[in-house]
């Protein structure tokens, strides 16, 4: 076994193990269970003792949770319409909840008649998900003195929330406290909520403004995929936190209400909410505002909840106060979230799950996004990105392929060394190393081109899987979604026969793969033909099977990733051929293909 084949076999085996490990650690997404839904929610627990500058966990009034649990949902609750260029929905005047929101720019599937994506839905519907705001009562107040989830707010008849027209909700508790809430929205996905209260009661009162995001049960479309974070996401003074739904059930129990909660005190900048594959909702206090960020799970009601509780305010008679917060509820678009981060929301781009190799995934996606904007086709953008990556690593590739060409030139001398050494392997290895040193050849250089691909492969896979911009991103023809496996299949001759291809999650799809994985296998096979087949029978068999094993293994990967690998193989073949030729060795590709077929025929004849 010569050193060049050893290196190539080692590097390919490492790639093979990486893909096997990928399947082991990142199995296909599991179908999420459908938990029962209860029409209840819990309000956050107010702080009755903390000073305004530094909120603390504090003691809470038990009446808050008790009142919230009595929420009644009726079909004739008045609503205010939400209508912007990008979202539609409504606000319920019962509780003032933002609980009905749909994203106009996104559909559930590629079908033209597919419904648009629903992000928020009211209590009483399966998998209810909504935002709720209010005031937690402190000294001098009871739960009946502040607006709750059951409070019926007043608003101007026919009012519609648009980017140009905010809406205002009001409620008078009849005891001297008047509450108002102004809700506005921008052209994208950011709501601004200003909560105000005026004290005309003649006595001092204490209360704490809060915001809540509540989910009844786990999301219906929970993917349970290891490579993707789904659950709570938050930023606390520059530190990102991610909590899966199943981890929330392991929080320490709160003896006051039996729920399980985790409380973080944020001193200056932060946000918290729920994130999914492509959509997210987050509560965002004003920059510089201290608050408590709470992640909570109510096991009895199966409700997941995130709260933002601002410092308690003591309001003297005749005084007014207000609290400003924001609510992001929409698609995790890189450009949109980047603009919000630039506007002052610290670390908001980290709400996209860039993974452990963020130092690779972030710049790779930024370049891919720019290329897609310039070209207008994501598939072509992936091909262009592959060219740029190959240019970036070309110095290493050149050195590697030049070394491989030198190894070919040394083959006659290496054969003489083997003949002289005979069965003395130690002597042969020693003389080989002296030869490499004398000729300044690195026998391990052949590994570099393949090994360099591994971190790029991981990073690009992450980019294709988690970023919204790849969802339903078209290439050409049948390839209308590069984030999913190749939709074509041998089963129906790539659409030529009048029956459907096997479902992506069926066993048949593993056998009847699409055209892209086949092109991948062929490109790997042709790339092997730059060198003659190994003389060792075991090596030759491994090399013969390897392209086709990779073809079937990568058949279930996102088609965008397979497009990258095919392009990479074609560029690598061209580079290697030209570099080796420039160093005096011209690979006989067609001759190697012919000799391979002749050997196969000879072996079959011998067996007969």
UniProtKB/Swiss-Prot annotation:
Q: What InterPro entries has UniProt attached to this entry? A: Membr_insert_YidC (IPR019998), Membr_insert_YidC_N (IPR028053), YidC/ALB3/OXA1/COX18 (IPR001708), YidC/Oxa/ALB_C (IPR028055), YidC_ALB_C (IPR047196), YidC_periplasmic_sf (IPR038221)
User: What cellular-component terms does GO give this entry?
Assistant: plasma membrane
List this protein's GO terms for biological process: protein insertion into membrane; protein transport
- What CDD domains does the database record attribute to this sequence? 5TM_YidC_Alb3, EcYidC-like_peri
Question: Which of UniProt's keywords are assigned here?
Answer: Cell inner membrane, Cell membrane, Chaperone, Membrane, Protein transport, Transmembrane, Transmembrane helix, Transport
The answer to whether keyword Cell inner membrane applies is yes
Q: Where is this protein localized, as stated in its record? A: Cell inner membrane
The record describes its membrane topology as: Multi-pass membrane protein
User: Record's superkingdom?
Assistant: Bacteria
Q: What GO molecular function terms would the record report?
A: membrane insertase activity
Q: Where are the annotated segments for Disordered?
A: 33-61
Give TM regions.
8-28, 378-398, 448-468, 482-502, 506-526, 542-562
Q: Which residues form a coiled coil?
A: none
Q: What does the annotation say about its assembly with partners?
A: Interacts with the Sec translocase complex via SecD. Specifically interacts with transmembrane segments of nascent integral membrane proteins during membrane integration.
As for family, the record states: Belongs to the OXA1/ALB3/YidC family. Type 1 subfamily.
Q: What does this protein do?
A: Required for the insertion and/or proper folding and/or complex formation of integral membrane proteins into the membrane. Involved in integration of membrane proteins that insert both dependently and independently of the Sec translocase complex, as well as at least some lipoproteins. Aids folding of multispanning membrane proteins.
> Under which name does UniProt file this protein?
Membrane protein insertase YidC
* The organism's taxonomic lineage, starting at the top: Bacteria, Pseudomonadati, Pseudomonadota, Alphaproteobacteria, Rhodobacterales
Q: Which gene encodes it?
A: yidC
């Amino acid at each position: 076994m010569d050193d060049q084949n050893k290196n190539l076999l080692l590097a390919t085996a490492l790639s093979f193990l990486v893909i096997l490990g990928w399947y082991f650690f990142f199995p296909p997404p599991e179908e999420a269970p459908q938990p029962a839904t209860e029409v209840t929610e819990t309000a956050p627990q107010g702080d009755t003792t903390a000073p305004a500058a530094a909120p603390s966990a504090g003691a809470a009034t038990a009446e808050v949770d008790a009142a919230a649990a009595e929420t009644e949902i009726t079909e004739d609750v008045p609503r205010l319409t939400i209508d912007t260029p990008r979202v539609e929905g409504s606000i319920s005047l019962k509780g003032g909840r933002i609980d009905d929101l749909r994203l106009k720019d996104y559909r559930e599937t590629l079908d033209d008649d597919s419904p648009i994506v629903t992000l928020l839905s009211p209590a009483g519907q399966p998998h209810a998900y909504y935002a709720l705001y209010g005031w937690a009562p402190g000294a001098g107040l009871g739960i009946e003195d502040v607006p709750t989830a059951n409070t019926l707010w007043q608003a101007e008849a026919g009012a519609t929330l648009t980017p140009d027209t905010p809406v205002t909700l009001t409620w008078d508790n009849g005891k001297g406290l008047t509450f108002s809430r102004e809700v506005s929205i921008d052209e994208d996905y950011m709501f601004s909520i200003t909560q105000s209260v005026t004290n005309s009661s003649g006595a001092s009162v204490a209360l704490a403004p809060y915001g809540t995001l509540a989910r009844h049960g786990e999301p219906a479309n929970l993917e349970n995929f290891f490579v993707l974070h789904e659950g709570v996401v938050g930023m606390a003074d520059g530190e990102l936190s991610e909590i899966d739904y199943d981890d929330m059930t392991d929080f320490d129990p709160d003896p006051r209400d039996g729920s399980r909660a985790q409380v973080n005190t944020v001193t200056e900048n932060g946000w918290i909410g729920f994130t999914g594959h492509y959509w997210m909702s987050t509560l965002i206090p004003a920059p510089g505002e201290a608050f408590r960020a709470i992640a909570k799970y109510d096991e009895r009601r199966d409700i997941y909840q995130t709260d933002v509780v601002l410092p308690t305010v003591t309001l003297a008679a005749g005084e007014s106060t207000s609290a400003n917060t924001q609510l992001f509820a929409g698609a995790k678009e890189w450009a949109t979230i980047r603009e919000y981060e630039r506007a002052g929301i610290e670390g908001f781009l980290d709400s996209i799950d860039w993974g452990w190799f963020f130092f690779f995934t972030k710049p790779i996606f930024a370049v891919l996004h720019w290329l897609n904007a310039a070209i207008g086709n994501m598939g072509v953008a992936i091909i262009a990105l592959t060219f740029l990556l190959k240019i970036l690593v070309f110095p290493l590739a050149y050195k590697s392929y030049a070394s491989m060409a030198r190894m070919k030139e040394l083959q006659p001398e290496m054969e003489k060394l083997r003949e002289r050494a005979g069965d003395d392997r130690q002597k042969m290895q020693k003389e080989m190393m002296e030869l490499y040193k004398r000729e300044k050849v690195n026998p391990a250089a052949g590994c570099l081109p393949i090994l360099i691909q591994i971190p790029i492969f991981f990073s690009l896979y992450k980019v294709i899987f988690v970023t919204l911009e790849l969802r339903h991103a078209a290439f050409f023809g049948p390839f209308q979604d590069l984030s999913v496996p190749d939709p074509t299949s041998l089963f129906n001759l790539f659409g030529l026969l009048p029956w459907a291809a096997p479902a992506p999650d069926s066993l048949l799809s593993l056998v009847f793969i699409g055209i892209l994985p086949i092109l991948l296998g062929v490109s790997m096979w042709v790339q092997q033909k730059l060198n003659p087949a190994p003389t060792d029978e075991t090596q030759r068999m491994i090399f013969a099977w390897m392209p086709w094993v990779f073809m079937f293994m990568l058949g279930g990967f996102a088609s965008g990733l397979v497009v990258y690998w095919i392009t990479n193989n074609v560029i690598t073949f061209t580079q290697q051929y030209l570099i080796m030729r420039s160093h005096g060795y011209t690979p006989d590709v067609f001759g190697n293909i012919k000799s391979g077929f002749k050997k196969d025929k000879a072996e079959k004849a011998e067996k007969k």
